[in-house]
Structure formats: C-alpha cells, structure tokens
Design a protein with these regions (language model features):
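ATP-dependent adenylation/nucleotidyltransferase module used to activate substrates
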Residues: 1-164
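Immediate flanking context of iron-sulfur cluster ligation sites
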Residues: 164-185
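Alpha-helix termini
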Residues: 25, 34-36, 178, 198-201
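Iron-sulfur (Fe-S) cluster-binding segments and ferredoxin-like electron-carrier domains
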Residues: 180-183, 188-209
Length: 209
C-alpha cells in the first residue's frame, strides 16, 4: 500500500485509496493505511467492509487456525480464496465510478508466499477482463492495472520506498500483529520484511513483540 501509493503520487497521479476490511486477523493494517492516506493527502480514502470470516480454509480469516511460522511447500494456509480478485473488482468498480483509468496494486511475485493471485499473468488476465467487462473499456477508454512491484524482491521494494521518502515505521506487514500494531516476528510476512531490510543493510523500524 505505502510504497505503491508513494510511487503513484510521485508520478503525478491524483490518488484515491481503497482498503478492504474483510475481518482479517491483521486488521491493524487498516489503522496504518488511514494514517498513510492522510499523510499522502489522497483525494479520497475508502474502507469497504466485507465479512470473509466464513472462508474457513484460510488462517487469516479463520481465527481458530494457527498462522504458520515455518515456510512450507505449496500455497500456505494464509492464502484467502480469491481475495485479490474480490479486492480488484471493488477497485475496478470504484475506478469506473470516478472515471479513473489507472488502478495500482502492490502485489509482488518474487519475495512472496506463493499466492496465485500475486502473479504477473494474473494481473494481465484481470486487466484484459476489466477492459471486456466495463462500460469504460468497451467504449475505448483503456483501463490499466499497474503492479510496479511485481518483479522486485523485498530489498528492492524497500529501497524504492526509501527513495520516495516512505516512512516504514508507519506500516505493518505482520499476519498476526498485536492490537497496538506490534509485529509477531514469526510469520512468513514478518520474515520476508525482516530479510528485506537485512539484505538492503538498513535499520528495520518495525516494532516487534
């Protein structure tokens, strides 16, 4: 969210920020996202509430499941079925409502957990669908899905963010942070973030438990 927002702002876009409260365990991110939206003075910031707690196969929505702390082969339990498709569809609907032609998303397919909806081919396919399934698209106004971080590793993403003055102390990546937003330092997301700062050789401002 933060790195992509900073990048879009620096590229001259008028930014509208969308966040989804889907009853995820890591809802602390909503607090940080609001602060970032205010910091970057977005035109409008929306939070859409969707209860996905009934998607019981994901440890991000099923609180009776443990968040895995050891990387595993295959797609981990933190995968939420079709999450990015739902989020992108809401973003697409809002973009068409406000006559916006560019949608930015911060997915990454290098240092990631193996989610199928974070891959470059998924982004291309969604963009094709967006231009087939919307009034804006069929009338000839191309809708672009921008995923500028898709081919970057975590260290490269952090470096890019720092070059655009991103304050990473205002962000949280953890799948199971405390109510105060302190990261667990055990989950896959914490590991990837921590290793990114280590590889870059800069101090990690994350508050860990």
């Amino acid at each position: 969210f933060c790195t992509v927002l900073a990048l879009a702002k620096s590229s001259g876009y008028d930014c509208y920020a969308l966040n989804i409260n889907y009853q995820q365990r890591h809802s602390a991110e909503l607090h940080y996202a609001k602060r970032l939206a205010e910091f970057y003075e977005v035109k409008e910031y929306k939070v859409v509430d969707i209860d996905l707690s009934w998607l019981s196969s994901s440890s991000l929505t099923n609180k009776s499941m443990d968040i895995p702390e050891i990387p595993s082969e295959g797609i981990p339990s933190t995968y939420v079925p079709a999450r990015n498709t739902m989020m992108m569809t809401l973003a697409l609907a809002w973009a068409e409502t406000i006559n916006c032609s560019d949608i930015f998303i911060g997915v990454n397919a290098i240092d990631y957990s193996g989610y199928p909806d974070c891959r470059e081919e998924y982004i291309h396919s969604f963009e094709k669908m967006a231009n087939l399934a919307t009034k804006k698209g069929v009338e000839g106004s191309k809708i672009s899905i921008n995923a500028p971080l898709i081919r970057m590793n975590k260290a490269e993403i952090i470096k890019l963010g720092l070059e655009h003055n991103v304050d990473y102390s205002m962000t949280v990546s953890c799948y199971q942070p405390s109510k105060k937003g302190h990261a667990c330092n055990k989950c896959d997301s914490c590991r990837l973030r921590r290793e990114g700062f280590q590889k870059l050789g800069v101090k990690d401002p994350t508050l860990y438990m």
